[in-house]
Amino acid sequence: MTQAFFFLLLVSLVASTLSKEFNFCPRAIDEVCPVKEKRNECCSSKECRFGEMCCSEPCGNVCRVKSDTPLGFPAKEDSNCKVGEIKKKWYQKVWSKITKWG
């Protein structure tokens, strides 16, 4: 009798764990990008491994393990997104020089 009870308890625990939806990005590792150049590891969650999703972080898009709480931001699927180094536009370079002086 006790073996059947523990078996049912184990099955229900596993079922409840597997049914939980993990569809959120975890909190970003850095609040501000510590490196000069940004780099995209992914542009869509389809480019990430199973159990991961493409998340937007200060240094670019990265594949992160899914979370059950919405602490981070998913990457916007954009046709202009390219994997690799993100080149700054001319006005972004000007703005970074202005803010460096101020």
Curated annotation (Swiss-Prot):
Cystine connections: none
Keywords assigned: Amidation, Disulfide bond, Secreted, Signal, Toxin
Domain of life: Eukaryota
Residues making up the signal peptide according to the UniProt record: 1-19
Residue ranges annotated as propeptide in the record: 20-39
Modified how: Contains 5 disulfide bonds.
Record localization: Secreted
Primary location class: secreted
Name this polypeptide is given: U7-agatoxin-Ao1a
Source species of the chain: Agelena orientalis (Funnel-web spider)
Lineage: Eukaryota, Metazoa, Ecdysozoa, Arthropoda, Chelicerata
